[in-house]
Structures are given as structure tokens and as C-alpha cells.
Amino acid sequence: MDELQRNQNKHRSWQQFFLYPLFFREDLYAIAHDHHLDRSGSSEPTEFLVSRFFSFLTVKRSIRRIRKQKNSISLLGNCDRNQFIECNKNFCSKSILEGLTVVLEVSFAMRSKHFIEGMDGWNSIRSIHCIFPLMEDKLPHSNYISDIRVPYSIHPEILVRIFRRWIRDTPSLHLLRSILHEWKNSFSRENLQKAIITQGENTRFSLFLWNSYVYECESFLVPLVKRFFNSQSLLYGSFPDRTHFDKKIKHIVIFPXRQISTKKIWLLKDSFIHYVRYGERSLIALKGTHLEVKKWRYHLLHFWQYYFHLWFQPYRIRSLELSKTYSSFLGYFLHVKMKPLVVRAKMLDNLFITDLITNELNPIAPIRSILFFLAKEKFCDISGWPISKLSWTSLSDDDILDRFDRIWINLFHYYSGSMNRDGLYHIKYILLLSCAKTLACKHKSTIRVVREQLGSELFTKSFSKEREFISSSFSKNRLQRERIWNSEISQINPLANFWQKMQNKQIEN
């Protein structure tokens, strides 16, 4: 009986790898279409959109074409030979792509769940606000950091090989290969990034491909690193699997046989590593010598080249010393500085005064880049002098105040942990004067007249959430001494994202 139960569980676990029968279910495409409507944000009624674009007859025709398709390369091409029904032609290709995405997302979620359960608390899906306290706790104990930009110029066959690890049915792989080759222009460096950022029709599919690719990188790299560092506390002779582990390193890094020695393996004995990623940017914090950092860089380069058969440009991995240089990540300049502390220790009748030097993370907000962005959006000129936002003069007074309020609150909450908060209050001054000038331009008056008419409402309604945030969290004196990492941050700030792209272009050039 127990053997029969094990066979049933094994058969049930293998059923999730066979995905091709799901493409012949009509309700799957209805679910995919509902997800598309929820993400589109269109102002048209839902009934009108469904009656205009969605048709179960078109779905049945698409399913029939999938069954009878011989030349799979043209599957997304001529979906409907009737040139008078253009919407059905577009819906055919969209429905196949969205249905494929829904099926793969469900299977990927089941696979990632089992992977996370076996990783002792490792979770690659966390909120962005967890990154800032992690960096504040871990980076001061590191002396080197590796800034990695994950390559996103992916060949379709690499993605097919990734999906072959957990998809067992051949028809699904053939369908996926035909779609990937048909959409291979979307996997280039610029187009894939554009597809992820913009709300295009292939955004969901591109995001899924990107997440699958990064998940495959982390699912192989993170367990290997954890296993290596967990083995450092054991003796070489009492570790029976050490020989097998050396063979893995030899296979991945492609060491010559004469270079594999106990001395080279034990270089990382007393070091530790911390890994964090957001989007395509990853940080690996290390504590060790410069030689160890160079070895990790060498290992990572060979990991991508031999495991994914993908050329990894050397400029995509930069090794920086935190105490001497700055690293840009998530819109911050990251730097570790020494902080002296005076400790008084009393022993019996003697009082000792000891000076201790500790490392402290010093995150800095890019104030000049924020001013450049505000000048680009016509809130101020190049020199930082506030000007009126002429495109907002047609709005009501409440809408103008609310828009300026949201801009400042987003900036203040995101950069609340920076050390140069004085620069943020300079940004606040620019936004306040720009708001007053916009209202004055709308009413064809001056700033003094607007201030007299609105009174304190101009400065109480606008930027009011900042005072609520400060008063509910810390006092003013404590605010000057400590940083506040806001837990309401769900994504990177648009200004920080714009600045980070500028930094990436400078690195490439």
C-alpha cells in the first residue's frame, strides 16, 4: 500500500511537467484575457472590450491551428488569412502568447516554491525596502564589493535549455522554441529592457523570461556559495564529500589539474559573502584580500560563460573597495567610512577611556542629478532657480498642490536614509517656489498675492505628510542623528531609476 501511494505521488508530481494539454482549454485564454484587461488600465468599459476583441470562436480556431500546425515557425505569423479581420489576427497571436505565459507562470511558481523550501530560508522574492537595512547591517563589515550587471542579451536557445530542466513534454518545448525564435528581436539588449519598462503587449512575457533567467542564475550560484562557506568550519579530512566538491569547482571554473590544491581552496576560510539583487544590478559584499576578490570575479565570469554559453563583458563586474570609492546602487552613492567612538570602561577604582573605530555605511543621495532631472521636467532652470510648471496651469489648485505634494513625498520617503538630507530640503525649497509660481501664473498674479490669498494653506496642505511621518517616527533631535528607512517603499523611485541609467551609460562608455 505504501509503495502504491509513493507511485501515485510520483505520478502526480510528473503531471505538472506536461503542460501542452493546458493549451487546449478555452477557460485558460479567458483567464489570460482578464489579466490583460486588469493590467491595461483602459478607460473603456470591460463589456465593450470583451465584445470587441475577445471571441471564443477565435480561441477555438487558435486551438485548432495549434493541433494541426506543421510549420511551427510561422505559428504567430499569419494567424488569420482574412485580411478584413485585423483584430482577430492580432488577438490570435496575443491569445497564444498570453496563454503560454499563464501556463508557464503557474508551473514556475510551483517549481520555485519547492526550491525555496529546500534552501533554508533563502527567498529571492522580497520587497525593496528590505534591501536598505540589509546593506546598513552587512556592508560596514565588508571591505570589498563586486558590482555586477546581469547580461540580458539572451539567445532563445539558452532560454529553451533552461525550460527543459522542468518541462518534460516535447510539444510544449517546440511551441516555446517557435515563439522565442519568432520574438527573438525582443531579446536584444535595448528591446528587452524597453519591453520590461514600458507597458507594451509583450511586457508580461518578457518579464517572465527575465525572471526565469535570473532565477536560474541564482538557483545554481547561491547554493554553491552557501555550501562552500558552510564547509569552511569542517576539517578537510573529516569532510567525505570534499573531493566531489573539488570536482565541481574544477568543472565550473575549469582549473588546470595542477592548480587545484588545498592552499588555493582555503584562501576564503575566514571570509564571508553577502548577495543582494534588484533588477539587473547585483551586489556581492566580501570581506577578504584583494586576491580573493579577483578570484571571485574570475569565477563569476567563467560561470556565465560556461554555464550559459554567454559572453560576459568584463566591464559588467567591477570590484570596488568600499573605504576608498563610491558605488551606485538603487539611486544611492554607497560608501563606508570610519566612525570614532569614545568608550569609558570602569574597572574597580580605575576609569579607562578607549577610542574605538567602527565602520558605518554612508549612503548619499545624488542631489545634482535630481536637480538635473527637475530642470529637465521644467520645475527649475539649469542653475536650480525655480520656475513655473506651465503645463499644469490648466489644472485646479488642489490638483497642482497634490502633484507637488506627491513628488516631494516620494523623494523624501525614498531618500530618508541618506546622510545629506540638507540637499533634500533644498529640493523641497525648489518645489515649494515652483508650486507657488505655477499658481501665480495660473491666476495671473504674483507669488505674494497667491500667498496672501491661500495663507498658510499653501504650506500646510502641500508637504504635510512629511511632518506626520517625522512626528510619528522620531523627534527632531533624533532625526538629525539617525537615518530612517521607510518600510512603505515598494519600488525604485523614478528619479533614482533615471540617475541609475545615467550611471550605467557612463560605465559602458
UniProtKB/Swiss-Prot annotation:
It comes from the Eukaryota. Pfam families: Intron_maturas2 (PF01348), MatK_N (PF01824). Belongs to the intron maturase 2 family. MatK subfamily. One of its GO terms (biological process) is tRNA processing. InterPro entries: Domain_X (IPR024937), Maturase_MatK (IPR002866), Maturase_MatK_N (IPR024942). GO terms for molecular function: RNA binding. Its main location: plastid. This is Maturase K. It is found in: Plastid, Chloroplast. The lineage of its organism: Eukaryota, Viridiplantae, Streptophyta, Embryophyta, Tracheophyta. It comes from Sequoia sempervirens (California redwood). Usually encoded in the trnK tRNA gene intron. Probably assists in splicing its own and other chloroplast group II introns. One of its GO terms (cellular component) is chloroplast. Keywords: Chloroplast, mRNA processing, Plastid, RNA-binding, tRNA processing.
